[in-house]
């Protein structure tokens, strides 16, 4: 049942959620960039509660609000900081969410097969980073993903793609397990008016 269906039937609306690392990994990045207490000040200014280290899934609106606050308040630094947070999120996933045996198996496969296995796993767990958006693998060669109605940039308007955090997460996972020199390029973005944010993986880099 969709949120729209629930409104029609009088049921509660769905609170779509995203994994806490979309905020947790940004906290040390903000502290490193702007000094002690910077993360708490940012969260307070954005009106977002600070998640604890054992937080479960967070409302996607908290993630989008903090990311948008950073882009609005620090437009020059935001792409780099969100990228750093995305790389750290990828490191967390590798350390805590993908079993070592699975990682060894992916690395042992020919790259095109390893990429397919990893992409399938990402799609299976896309609810953790796409929230109310819809993730799908668009093509295999070149490997491309998209997140339709990406909630992390909901309501944004920009001349350039904004999904530095998502792109960096994908980059870290594929660089560690499949293509060491991979680059991830966002070729379409909801913030630019596209129906989906699309990411193209370049195995040999840019």
From Swiss-Prot:
Pathway: Porphyrin-containing compound metabolism; bacteriochlorophyll biosynthesis (light-independent). InterPro entries: BchJ, NO_sig/Golgi_transp_ligand-bd, V4R. Keywords: Bacteriochlorophyll biosynthesis, Chlorophyll biosynthesis, Photosynthesis. NCBIfam families: BchJ. Gene3D superfamilies: Trafficking protein particle complex subunit 3. GO terms for biological process: light-independent bacteriochlorophyll biosynthetic process; photosynthesis. The keyword Disulfide bond does not apply. The lineage of its organism: Bacteria, Pseudomonadati, Pseudomonadota, Alphaproteobacteria, Rhodobacterales. This is Bacteriochlorophyll synthase 23 kDa chain.
